[in-house]
From Swiss-Prot:
It catalyses: all-trans-octaprenyl diphosphate + 4-hydroxybenzoate = 4-hydroxy-3-(all-trans-octaprenyl)benzoate + diphosphate. It is an enzyme of class 2 (transferase). GO terms for molecular function: 4-hydroxybenzoate polyprenyltransferase activity. The chain crosses the membrane at residues 18-38, 42-62, 93-113, 136-156, 161-181, 209-229, 233-253, 264-284. This is 4-hydroxybenzoate octaprenyltransferase. InterPro entries: HB_polyprenyltransferase-like, Prenyltransferase, UbiA_prenyltransferase, UbiA_sf.
């Protein structure tokens, strides 16, 4: 394999842009920390960190495969490996299968409940990229896909799925819809032109308000989670920090400028990080 081909595969998996991996990793760590009520099992932690990297990469590959005929018409995505011809559709599918199989082999080291849950995760990862053609709610499907690691991680750590798992699942899904709508605001004009659907288009002039409401509901549910587990001040400080970051994001998107909307999206990495840190300290 040539250096250029390897570089194209690397870019196709978005290994040069880790934001998506981080946004998937943080809620996975939330689940592991809460399920373990502190430090998770090291084997489980390693499997899920590696699994997050592999599955996020697989998701990027199948997403670009699904979008290969439209990415060439969007300024931000014209130079991606598939529309630029550096990777063929067949090569992308083979890479997706290799990543998916590698992820599944990792899951096979977990308990039966986790293995059963993994099948739904694979389905969600595969269908999400195609939703933008059929519904204005692809961000909802991303919320489901990015949140599915939560019940899987919880099951791997505790071998059970109490109802609170789905509460944490909902928290992350709401947050994901909010930040992916910010991301969709970057491409809104191009998406309207080529017929791709998104919540940014659906919400229209109410986009900032609805993002704000989703963020507010996320914070309220986080506070309730802290009360349920009787967590200490460190967790509430992390929720307060997340709220401050949400306010900053609202400031960034106030004029709907592409670059600033993208910065708001990237800022969500810090939201996930401070919440993971707050949970870890609270359960320590």
């Amino acid at each position: 394999m040539s250096v250029e081909k390897a570089k194209a595969y690397w870019q196709l998996m978005r290994m040069d842009r880790p934001i998506g991996t981080l946004l998937l990793l943080w809620p996975t760590l939330w689940a592991l920390i809460i399920a373990a009520e502190g430090t998770p099992d090291w084997h489980v932690l390693l499997v899920f960190v590696l699994g997050v990297v592999l599955m996020r990469s697989a998701g990027c590959v199948i997403n670009d495969f699904a979008d290969r005929k439209v990415d060439g018409h969007v300024k931000r995505t014209q130079q991606r490996p598939l529309p630029s011809g550096r990777v063929t559709a067949k090569e992308a599918i083979i890479l997706f299968l290799l990543l998916g199989i590698s992820s599944f082999l990792l899951v096979l080291t977990m308990n039966p409940l986790t293995i059963q849950l993994s099948f739904a995760g694979i389905v969600l990862a595969f269908i999400y990229p195609f939703m933008k053609r059929y519904t204005h709610l692809p961000q909802l499907f991303l919320g489901l896909a990015f949140s599915w690691a939560i019940p899987m991680a919880w099951a791997a750590q505790a071998n059970e799925l109490p109802w609170v798992v789905w509460f944490v699942f909902a928290i992350n899904a709401l947050w994901t819809i909010a930040y992916d709508t910010q991301y969709a605001m970057v491409d809104r004009d191009d998406d309207v032109h080529i017929g791709v659907k998104s919540t940014a288009i659906l919400f229209g002039r109410h986009d900032k308000l609805i993002i704000g409401l989703l963020q507010l509901l996320t914070l309220v549910m986080l506070v309730w989670l802290g009360l349920h587990y009787q967590l200490g001040q460190s967790f509430y400080w992390s929720v307060l920090a997340a709220g401050a970051l949400f306010v900053y994001q609202q400031h960034l998107i106030r004029h709907r400028q592409r670059e600033l909307c993208f910065q708001a999206f990237l800022n969500n990495n810090y939201v996930g990080m401070v919440l993971a840190l707050g949970l870890f300290v609270a359960f320590w």
